[in-house]
Design a protein with these regions (language model features):
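Donor nucleotide-sugar binding/catalytic pocket of nucleotide-sugar-dependent glycosyltransferases
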Residues: 13, 114-151
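A short, histidine- and acid-enriched strand-loop-helix "catalytic/donor-clamping" loop
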Residues: 35, 86-103, 117-118, 147
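Conserved donor-binding/catalytic core segment of Leloir-type glycosyltransferases
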Residues: 152-171, 177-183, 189
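Nucleotide-activated donor-binding/catalytic signature segment of Leloir-type glycosyltransferases, i.e.
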Residues: 198-218
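Acidic donor-binding loop of glycosyltransferase active sites
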Residues: 225-239
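Short hydrophobic beta-strand element within catalytic cores of glycosyltransferases
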Residues: 229, 251-256
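Conserved acidic donor-binding segment of nucleotide-sugar-dependent glycosyltransferases
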Residues: 269-278, 284-292
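A charged, aromatic-enriched C-terminal amphipathic alpha-helix characteristic of glycosyltransferases
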Residues: 292-323
Length: 337
């Protein structure tokens, strides 16, 4: 069975790696020239709808996986499925349920979840939300990350923390910078577009923090693999941190926020913090002094995650078999292409 994976986004490694694991193709469908302003969003989505329709018409997949949000990305997939007898699987990220912009469209998310073969969900809390809608949920905590090419990272002589950020509203950026100032012996490489960083924070940037700006996939992979730890934090509960499992799959320790979800997801090779500057600085010092033990823990966690993904992939394929009546598994356990 042929699989296409649609994401209305500039980039999404989760979509790319999930598509790869299922033997399908990942497509980033995005028109950046329209931005995300209210005055232009209709034109942007209309253009992306046409692009999606063209991809599906050319590939003619038997199963279409769609990342939400935006929930509207699923509409052309369902239209195609209705006409071709295909199956649709939603990959619902945390923002699909919790972001203020998308809460007003929960009625549409609910309707589409109920019509999908299954909805891929990142944690038990959101799985319960989907099941309460009368829909089928498949728990996918994370997906194996394999970097096809890694650019060597020219690390300084000091310990290195890769602070993976997007400067979103749920990231404690001020606390991270304050913590960096408390551990001048450690260098922080902070990813993300600096234009989204508040000017007052940029004005008091510690000397041991480097804003990397945009990184190519190869350079980002080099940073994740070469750092002593990857730090990714959120003030929002029930949020899975993609950068953290990207790091664990490379055997790199992580510093993550102290939420129940993240304690369960990263139970080895990880330091959990309460998002205060003092706690973050303490976690960084722990990485600097106990790096080898944490790295061994990250490798153990990676092995367990790989085993769990094998089971999850089989569950997704089995669900598609049930809803399509066909055999989807190839010889290597991947969805047929």
């Amino acid at each position: 069975m042929k699989v296409s994976y649609i994401s209305w986004a500039e980039s999404c490694s989760r979509s790319d790696h999930t598509a790869r694991e299922l033997g399908g193709r990942s497509h980033m469908v995005y028109l950046p020239q329209f931005g995300s302003r209210a005055a232009t969003i209709v034109f942007k989505y209309a253009g992306q709808w046409r692009m999606t329709a063209r991809i599906l018409r050319e590939e003619r997949p038997d199963a279409v996986f769609v990342m939400t949000p935006p929930v509207f990305a699923a509409l052309p997939a369902f239209w195609y499925a209705w006409r071709r007898g295909a199956r649709v699987v939603l990959d619902a990220h945390t923002a699909a349920f919790l972001h203020p912009r998308w809460k007003r469209f929960q009625w549409l998310q609910r309707m589409l979840c109920r019509r999908a073969a299954t909805t891929l969900i990142h944690n038990q809390h959101q799985a319960a939300l989907v099941e309460a809608m009368g829909a089928h949920a498949t728990l996918v905590l994370d997906v194996p990350i394999i970097y096809p090419s890694v650019e060597p990272f020219a690390r300084p002589a000091t310990p290195v923390i890769a602070a993976v950020c997007s400067f979103n509203y749920d990231e404690p950026i001020a606390e991270i910078l304050e913590a960096a100032a408390q551990v001048p012996e450690v260098h922080f490489f902070m990813t993300g577009n600096p234009k989204h960083l508040a000017p007052e924070l940029k004005a008091r940037m510690p000397a041991n923090v480097t804003l990397t700006g945009f990184l190519s996939d190869e350079a980002y992979a080099g940073l994740v693999c070469g750092a002593d730890a990857v730090m990714t934090l959120t003030t929002r509960d029930h949020t899975m941190l993609r950068a953290a499992y990207e790091a664990i799959y490379q055997g790199t320790p992580v510093i993550v926020s102290d939420w129940t979800l993240l304690r369960a997801a990263f139970d080895d090779g990880a330091v959990h913090v309460n998002n205060t500057a003092a706690a973050i600085a303490g976690a960084v010092r722990r990485v600097a002094t106990n790096g080898e033990a944490l790295r061994a823990g990250a490798r153990r966690a990676r092995d367990r995650k790989l085993q769990r993904w094998t089971q999850t992939r089989s569950a997704i394929a089995a669900r598609l078999v049930v809803t399509s009546g066909g055999s989807l598994l190839g010889e290597k356990g991947k969805v047929r292409s």
